[in-house]
Curated annotation (Swiss-Prot):
Core subunit of the mitochondrial membrane respiratory chain NADH dehydrogenase (Complex I) which catalyzes electron transfer from NADH through the respiratory chain, using ubiquinone as an electron acceptor. Essential for the catalytic activity and assembly of complex I. It is a multi-pass membrane protein. One of its GO terms (biological process) is mitochondrial electron transport, NADH to ubiquinone. It is an enzyme of class 7 (translocase). GO terms for molecular function: NADH dehydrogenase (ubiquinone) activity. Keywords: Electron transport, Membrane, Mitochondrion, Mitochondrion inner membrane, NAD, Respiratory chain, Translocase, Transmembrane, Transmembrane helix, Transport, Ubiquinone. Core subunit of respiratory chain NADH dehydrogenase (Complex I) which is composed of 45 different subunits. Interacts with TMEM242. The gene is MT-ND2. Its EC number is 7.1.1.2. InterPro entries: Complex_I_Subunit_2 (IPR050175), NADH_DH_su2_C (IPR010933), NADH_UbQ_OxRdtase_chain2 (IPR003917), ND/Mrp_TM (IPR001750). Its main location: mitochondrion. This is NADH-ubiquinone oxidoreductase chain 2. The keyword Zinc does not apply. It comes from Potos flavus (Kinkajou). The lineage of its organism: Eukaryota, Metazoa, Chordata, Craniata, Vertebrata. Signal peptide: none annotated.
Length: 347
């Protein structure tokens, strides 16, 4: 993709997200979503293969459907209340429509089917944008309308998403699909706490974005897309592969890594709100995600696949690729647990 075109597309994606985040008017919010969606499609199609075209089409259909439901909810709210503002949304029918539309945009269960297929069909860099930046706008709207959201509706979607995210990743060998199912599960954790403590949802989103960005950057660094290629990366990048496995366990929420922080704080927040069964179910279902991450770690680190290269290290190395943001991102993704008491202000 030529640099001028890339600059225009990237600026449109960023502008669309900023419009959604800063707007308190439903029409401007909807326009921001449309800017974001239409600008990200060329990013998904940049490889110009049948698979990427199919993935971009699936993404467009899912997002366009969600946008139509969102507009239906906005118009219903306008007819019943006579206002375009996002704050003080008192009508429950319109609020439910908007919540369903936003869950579809996020890929929460039961509207999660497009997420693994689209992520698998695009390149690693496009998948990184899809699973990180594209989550910011819908979650910012959920944050703004959280007082008017039906807690039961979001709780059902959250528990179903954590279950689907853990169950769906069990049989996967494609790393992009594993991260897609991980995204579904993480979105479920964020949705679960949205109606009780939206600021905690924002913290979870920040931690998730940093961990996922680090993982995708390391996959791009080592050119790994499957479990097999990741195990072969030991020959060329033993340190990078070790970092990938640590990030995987952090994404799974294994203490004492940083991924444990949001799960810990969300369970604590739900318990403070006299929710006992829900956090118990969430913690049990999170073991499914942790299991496939641990299995991936075991398959990669302890059971090396047969390879024609008999040496542990290659004598000739490629030139080092410069990734300036990678080091601080990895530190944040793995070593933030001691700072948890400082974050308790969110509770």
């Amino acid at each position: 993709m030529k640099p001028p075109i890339l600059i225009i597309i990237a600026s449109t994606i960023i502008s669309g997200t900023i419009v959604v985040m800063m707007s308190t008017h439903w029409l401007m919010t909807w326009i921001g979503f449309e800017m974001n969606m239409l600008a990200v499609i060329p990013i998904l199609m940049k490889n110009f293969t049948p698979r990427s075209m199919e993935a971009a089409t699936k993404y467009f259909l899912a997002q366009a459907t969600a946008s139509m439901i969102l507009m239906l909810g906005i118009i219903t709210n306008l007819l019943l209340t006579g206002q375009w503002t996002m704050l003080n949304n008192q009508n429950q029918i319109a609020s439910n429509m908007m919540t369903i539309a936003l869950t579809m945009k996020l890929g929460l269960s039961p509207f999660h089917f497009w997420v693994p297929e689209v992520t698998q069909g695009v390149s690693l860099s496009s998948g990184m944008i899809l699973l990180t930046w594209q989550k910011i706008a819908p979650l910012s709207v959920l944050h703004q309308i959280s007082p008017s959201i039906n807690p039961n509706l979001l709780a059902i979607a959250a528990i179903a998403s954590i279950l689907v995210g853990g169950w769906g990743g069990l049989n996967q060998t494609q790393l992009r699909k594993i991260l897609a199912y991980s995204s579904i599960a993480h979105m479920g954790w964020m949705a679960a706490v949205t109606t009780y403590n939206p600021d905690l949802m924002t913290l979870n989103l920040m931690m998730y974005i940093v961990m996922t960005l680090s993982t995708f950057m390391l996959f791009m660094y080592s050119s790994s897309t499957t479990t097999l290629s990741l195990s072969h990366a030991w020959n060329k990048f033993p340190l990078i592969t070790s970092l990938i496995l640590m990030l995987m366990m952090s994404l799974g929420g294994l203490p004492p890594l940083s991924g444990f922080i949001p799960k810990w704080m969300i369970v604590q927040e739900l318990t403070k709100n006299d929710m006992i069964i829900m956090p118990t179910l969430m913690a049990m279902m999170a073991l499914l995600s942790l299991f496939f991450y641990m299995r991936l770690t075991y398959a990669t680190a302890l059971t090396l696949f047969p390879t024609t290269n008999n040496m542990k290290m290659k004598w000739q190395f490629e030139s080092t690729k410069k990734m300036i943001l990678l080091s601080p991102a990895i530190v944040i993704s793995t070593m933030m647990l001691p700072l948890t008491p400082m974050m308790s202000i969110l509770n």
